[in-house]
């Protein structure tokens, strides 16, 4: 691959080149560097401490806890990665060493990476095995990958043929799809962060810039490598999350097939302007299908295709019978909250989510209502809910009640009030041990605890995925119930509502349902309101519709309330519905068989 002087390998993790799990006499050498089992603090000698500096190479005899260091695998701008041997098992691991800074934000990113990589269970995503810390360093112990970076493969070959690139790309989007479905956006996708193991399969690494995202909220942090960064990051606009990963995936595919980055310039400001323009050329002839896919991924955010369309594209599936497998389970509605799991998550995620119990209790009440309702699938995408599912999935169905590790081990109190930023590394250390306490060899995690999840629903007979796209509430199901109820009011709806000029309550409901069907808005009627989801041409919005009857004016009012922070999208949907209501007019213009 041709590269400019500015396009250098700067990964925090480099794959190892040699593979050997033969046990050495490391057990006899384990007399120093012992770990405090309650706090995760490793005792480091002054001599060994020198090695952990990013610019210092291997120092003979260095060790971290039970891990004997072998060699430096790579150095990045923020960390170094070393190969080490577990002196108890003889297995190799990769240890990411990050020097701690006074900035609290840097620590939070490390905590987040540790939590995500300890909870995720995907064949193409790197797994975190352990976590240690000192006052100066964090140590993230990952599984060891024998192989090389995708960067090195492209550099050696110049570019990849389309069949080879397609195989890697399908595995990459499988990993990214799994992340997105678990409400995590990577934000640093690039060829340096993709490893190819000795079996020619990929591993996605370095979740140091990742974050949880919510479709109802927006992110605003600039992250990642400039060459792979989406234009909205450079423009400083807020974003949901998955769309910036899709851009980066488009750049990765371009680099694999062409051998160059699509945007390049020695002047950083000129490079930024090129990226913002979204205009590039194909420097090498590739198939029309590949060109079409890349072109639709490297577009402005409002025109860019989503990951689902990438998965379904013609080029991605050439030669394959099925779409890529994201290795997601079908999650059942919960019927109770496991207090141990909740308490562990509250402690571990205290730096980001402070209302976990409230959110989970609200989700529990929704699950106790209609099974697989639109509202339940909507709430099931919330990061807090997903974190609960991910943690439960770490334990098999028989063992959740006897979870062996207390997340507060090493703390003087079990109260969340006692959690401080100083104690957070201890909590993260214990949480990683907590999630790895029960090893589960089943990569699919097919079954959940019958005591926590709905008992009467057998997994293998389930056909619905808990995604908003798969939940289509039929019109007949809604018409069976006389929902939502039209609430009588004097004030509500008068100022913010859309007035219905004529018609009784049946007419009003029929008009609303007709409009929702005409606009292809997925909806569900409950006792209080219509719960609605609209997604079209890049516009996505979740909202509810309440119906009121003013007892003084004898008029009906339709009130729309936005459920997320995408106000522009909500305004557009409101205008569409208002326009449709005006088109319908009074009852004389409304056909009796409209629905």
Swiss-Prot record:
Pfam name, any one: Pkinase
A Gene Ontology biological process term: exocytosis
Source domain of life: Eukaryota
Residue positions of the active site: 188 (proton acceptor)
Keyword Cytoplasm among UniProt keywords: yes
Catalytic class of the enzyme: transferase
Reaction(s) this enzyme catalyzes, per UniProt: L-seryl-[protein] + ATP = O-phospho-L-seryl-[protein] + ADP + H(+); L-threonyl-[protein] + ATP = O-phospho-L-threonyl-[protein] + ADP + H(+)
EC numbers, comma separated: 2.7.11.1
GO molecular function, one term: protein serine kinase activity
PANTHER family: KP78A-RELATED (PTHR24346:SF82), MAP/MICROTUBULE AFFINITY-REGULATING KINASE (PTHR24346)
Name of this protein: Probable serine/threonine-protein kinase KIN1 homolog
UniProt organism field: Enterocytozoon bieneusi (strain H348) (Microsporidian parasite)
Highest classification ranks of the organism: Eukaryota, Fungi, Fungi incertae sedis, Microsporidia, Enterocytozoonidae
Designated gene of the protein: KIN1
